[in-house]
Design a protein with these regions (language model features):
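Hydrophobic alpha-helical and helix-loop surface patches within well-folded domains
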Residues: 1-126, 130, 135-136
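A generic secondary-structure signal for well-formed alpha-helical elements
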Residues: 2-8, 64-72, 80-88, 98-105, ...
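Acidic/polar loop patches that form or flank catalytic/metal-binding clefts of enzymes
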Residues: 4-14, 71-76, 104-111, 120-122, ...
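Tryptophan-centered motif/residue detector
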Residues: 14-15, 112, 156, 432, ...
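Long, ordered, helix-rich scaffold segments
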Residues: 23, 50, 202-552
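Structural beta-strand/beta-sheet cores of well-ordered domains, especially the beta-sheet scaffolds
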Residues: 59, 94, 119-125, 132-134, ...
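K/E-rich alpha-helical interaction surfaces of small helical-bundle regulatory domains
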Residues: 71, 177-180, 247-254
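Beta-strand-rich binding/interaction modules
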Residues: 105-108, 116-214, 327, 331, ...
Length: 552
């Protein structure tokens, strides 16, 4: 993470980290496979290499650095190498080095390594216009997880700022009497440590209503619960100085609309909310700035993100339909700006992998995607022309991806031409297979079964399995098909792979980790497939471990 941040854009890398964490680790924490970063026990060591151990584990080190500061962290790393190089070091050995370098007791922080689950941090705010104060009530809660019904409060570093109604950042002046000396020093650098279940803070000398800019830089792996108005989110999307908060404001606004649409698809659309959201995006696009960041702002939350937000009784078809409609809304509302971006960002210069060039390509391809979502008849020729004339694989794959989201003849022509051109390149054919497996349309499962019978596919090739079958398992709409065909297909593949490659079989089986979130019919169908797998006497220890925990 840090290497890429230093070499490319720190903001874009951080957003990518957060997307990965939420998609993989938050989902793991919310299901039957939840476990701590350092589990007390395990049944199969091959199942130890999880998003929790790796992705959440990285976030703990990031939090540690934030809590003790860069200098103390650097000294602690050096001390760790001096003390522990060549030894079987433990988490306790690791943390002891940072206690020595910082003078801080990290026993409470160590609970992050022991306790499973994603904490929720709630911020309740009250502004007193007469007193010119803002009162914040902070609270944290971690839900029960398998084997850990009771949770303790954690040390949560909450990076925070205040934004005025004009979009300017305001100084943090708090009632310092409520803090000890260490906490007052942390507040000066925009940090509040939430170490108990609740904490009350009052900011003073605020002559205007403010917007709270919380969890800057995604300072902790938590779910933030905050009752921001649409107006507040629009302000943050346009003016917040922290890129993560700006991006999160757009994500939160879109999520609000998408969750409402998925929960009550027949109740009508929130036209005023959609108009306000698209206007906020228009202002962000018109402001210019880093093209790569603008591309992130324009990318809606994924179907997995929306399902996780809904939490239970999830209907993947309703989520897909709502997301497609909102993508089309954004494309129509911003069609003039998007078409201008698409044309202005075209380049005849030789391909360069530098960050600036990559950002321009990302924004141009995002514009193409939204334009095609809004008007398939107009966007498809643009995508086909880009596919034909692209000077680099990024642009050609982006155009093919857009075409694969349509059901046009141009899609099939482009797929055939792509295959003929790159049939001898294994890595590119992996991508070709994956694109087809992730098509959201009916008939995708039949297409995948057909591709499995071609010479390009072999169950003995893990990369091919990950690309085609793993791609389908990640296809939220088709894997969760209401007739259970997606569950049956992946379950059959798990059983076929298990005797030969249980590690890959387990990765496919992880697609079932959120089965309890589905609406009742899908729940029953997914459970039936899991119990069928569980009933096979010859299962490997790897698959047996995951299926037993999934059904526990």
């Amino acid at each position: 993470q840090e290497f890429t941040s230093d070499q490319r854009s720190r903001a874009i890398q951080r957003i990518a980290d957060v997307r990965t964490l939420r998609a993989q680790q938050f989902s793991e924490d919310a299901g039957p496979l939840a476990h701590s970063v350092r589990p007390d026990t395990y049944r199969e060591i091959n199942n130890f290499y999880t998003a929790t151990v790796y992705e959440k584990g990285a976030e703990l080190v990031r939090m540690l650095k934030m809590l003790i500061g860069d200098d103390a962290f650097s000294r602690g790393i050096q001390l760790y190498f001096e003390r522990c190089d060549g030894t079987a070091a433990t988490v306790e050995d690791f943390l002891a080095c940072f206690e020595a370098s910082s003078g801080r007791d990290l026993q409470h922080f160590a609970l992050w390594y022991e306790q499973a689950g994603t904490p929720s941090v709630t911020i309740a705010a009250s502004y007193d216009q007469d007193a010119k104060t803002l009162s914040l009530e902070l609270s944290q809660e971690t839900p029960p997880t398998p084997g850990q019904p009771d949770k303790k409060p954690l040390v949560i570093p909450l990076a925070i700022g205040l934004i005025g109604e004009s979009g300017t950042e305001l100084p943090l002046k708090a009632e310092i009497d409520a803090f000890d000396g260490a906490s007052a020093a942390e507040l000066k650098r925009g940090l509040i440590e939430l170490t108990s279940a609740r904490r009350h803070i009052v900011f003073r000398d605020l002559g205007e209503r403010v917007v709270i800019s919380a969890l800057r830089g995604f300072s902790a792996p938590v779910q933030l619960v905050q009752s921001a108005s649409d107006e507040d989110l629009s302000l943050q999307c346009a003016f917040d100085p922290d890129p993560c908060v700006r991006w999160q404001a757009a994500q939160t606004y879109a999520t609000r609309l998408l969750v409402a649409a998925a929960r009550a698809p027949a109740s009508g659309r929130n036209h005023s909310g959609i108009a306000s959201f698209t206007e906020a995006l228009r202002k962000a696009v018109s402001a210019g700035g880093d093209p790569a960041f603008t591309a992130q702002l324009l990318t809606l939350p994924s179907e997995t993100d929306i399902a996780r937000e809904i939490g239970d009784n999830v209907d993947p078809d309703a989520i897909y339909d709502g997301r497609q409609r909102l993508r089309a809304d954004v494309g129509r509302a911003l069609s003039t700006e998007l078409l201008r971006l698409y044309r202005d960002l075209a380049s005849d210069a030789p391909y360069s992998p530098d960050a600036a060039s990559a950002g321009r390509r990302a924004l141009r391809n995002t514009a193409l995607d939204l334009l095609t979502s809004a008007d398939e008849a107009a966007g498809t020729p643009l995508a086909r022309a880009q596919f034909d004339t692209a000077s680099n694989m990024t642009d050609r794959i982006a155009a093919l991806t857009v075409l694969c989201l349509t059901e046009s003849a141009a899609r099939e022509d482009a797929l055939e031409e792509f295959y003929k051109r790159y049939a001898g390149d294994a890595l590119i054919i992996d991508k070709w297979l994956s694109l087809q497996a992730t098509m959201p349309h009916p008939g995708t499962l039949d297409r995948v079964r057909g591709l499995m019978r071609t010479e390009q596919f072999s169950m003995a090739n893990p990369n091919r399995v990950r690309a085609l079958i793993g791609g389908f398992a990640a296809n939220q709409r088709q894997f969760n098909a209401p007739d259970g065909s997606g569950y049956d297909f992946i379950g059959e593949c798990v059983l076929l792979l298990d005797p030969k490659n249980p590690h890959v079989a387990v990765r496919l089986l992880s697609a079932f980790r959120t089965w309890r979130m589905m609406e009742p019919r899908r729940c029953r169908l997914a459970e039936a497939m899991l119990r069928r797998i569980q009933g096979v006497a010859s299962l490997s220890p790897d698959v047996r471990d995951i299926v037993d925990r999934s059904l526990a």
